[in-house]
Every structure is written in structure tokens, then in C-alpha cells.
Amino acid sequence: MAGSGRDRDPLVVGRVVGDVLDAFVRSTNLKVTYGSKTVSNGCELKPSMVTHQPRVEVGGNDMRTFYTLVMVDPDAPSPSDPNLREYLHWLVTDIPGTTAASFGQEVMCYESPRPTMGIHRLVFVLFQQLGRQTVYAPGWRQNFNTKDFAELYNLGSPVAAVYFNCQREAGSGGRRVYP
């Protein structure tokens, strides 16, 4: 029997579903762009390319529908020992449908990824809100839990998600190990 479509879903293959999210059905468009580079699942972006917050465009068909955007790193501080999973890089709420994250309410400002060891997945998750709501900034960025956050604020399942891979650039300091 051939594998189901879910087997080839890049969010499943990249273990975003499981490590960060439960399986969900995408129902809204989410476009994340750093400069001229649009994020696609599993693409590689260098830390120098992601120092400034990206442009995030949200689909939907009604400006009276609001969305919450979460950006997390489930591989902090390293993929082999992710004891800070998930590290919260950005949190924006009340984004009107058909607009961009810049029209929302920034709860936690963007912090650029600076991975030191291994390849890190940086995950953008979009939730549809039931209406405008007050979201409180977490006390810290490490050990954030996207699923618990969604439950706390009654956000339900995600409506979109996309992730990219990021690793420390060669020549950016640190110890060198030669074979």
C-alpha cells in the first residue's frame, strides 16, 4: 500500500509535527519573507539572513478575523540536547486577516536566531483567534510550549505553519575541530 500524503508532509518529515505541533489541516496562507527569500519548509537560511524580523503575510478573506503568530526554535540550545525546547523568538497577536504581522500587536519582540551547535529548525505557527484578545508576554523565552499556549488562549489547532533550518556560519567564532 502506498504511503498517505501525510507521510510526505514536510512538517511531518521535519518532525515539526510531533516536536512542536500536533497534526493539523492547513486552512490559511502564511508567507514569511526575509529580504527577497521566501521561507519554504526545510529550506536553509544563514543567521546573517535572519537578523531582522521577516515580513509575514497572512491569508484569510476577512480583516475582521484575527490571527496569532508564534516563532519558536525546538532545538535550543542544541538538537542533541534540546533542554530549552521551545525557545520563543517572536509572538504577535491580533493580526487582521489579509494583512501582515506588522499590523498586529507584538507581545514578544523578534529575537534573531543565533544557533551555536547543530542545525536548528525555526518554526512559524499561525493560529486563528476567536476574536481580539489580550495575550500576556511569557516571563521568559526558553521552555515555551506552543501547544500549551494555544490551549491557554483557546486558539485551537494551527491554521498554517512553515519552518526553515539554520546553523552557525563558518568563520563566526568558536572552536575549530579538524579531522
UniProtKB/Swiss-Prot annotation:
The Swiss-Prot or TrEMBL record annotates one GO molecular function as:
phosphatidylethanolamine binding
Question: Taking the first listed entry, what is the main subcellular location of this protein, grouped into a coarse class?
Answer: cytoplasm
Q: What tissues harbor this protein?
A: Expressed in the inner region of the SAM, stem and leaf blade vascular tissues (at protein level).
Signal sequence range: none
- Cell location: Cytoplasm; Nucleus
Q: What factors induce this protein? A: Expressed with a circadian rhythm showing a peak at dawn and then decreasing to reach the lowest levels early in the night in SD conditions.
One annotated Gene Ontology cellular component of this protein: cytoplasm
Entries under SUPFAM superfamilies matching the protein: PEBP-like
Record key words, sorted? Cytoplasm, Developmental protein, Differentiation, Flowering, Nucleus
| UniProt GO BP | cell differentiation; flower development; inflorescence development; regulation of flower development; regulation of timing of transition from vegetative to reproductive phase; short-day photoperiodism; short-day photoperiodism, flowering; vegetative to reproductive phase transition of meristem
Question: InterPro entries from the xrefs?
Answer: PEBP, PEBP-like_sf, PEBP_euk, Phosphatidylethanolamine-bd_CS
**Pfam name, any one:** PBP
Which family, according to UniProt?
Belongs to the phosphatidylethanolamine-binding protein family.
Q: What does this protein do?
A: Probable mobile flower-promoting signal (florigen) that moves from the leaf to the shoot apical meristem (SAM) and induces flowering. Promotes the transition from vegetative growth to flowering downstream of HD1 and EHD1 under short day (SD) conditions. Acts upstream of MADS14 and MADS15.
This chain's protein is named Protein HEADING DATE 3A
* Gene symbol of the encoding locus: HD3A
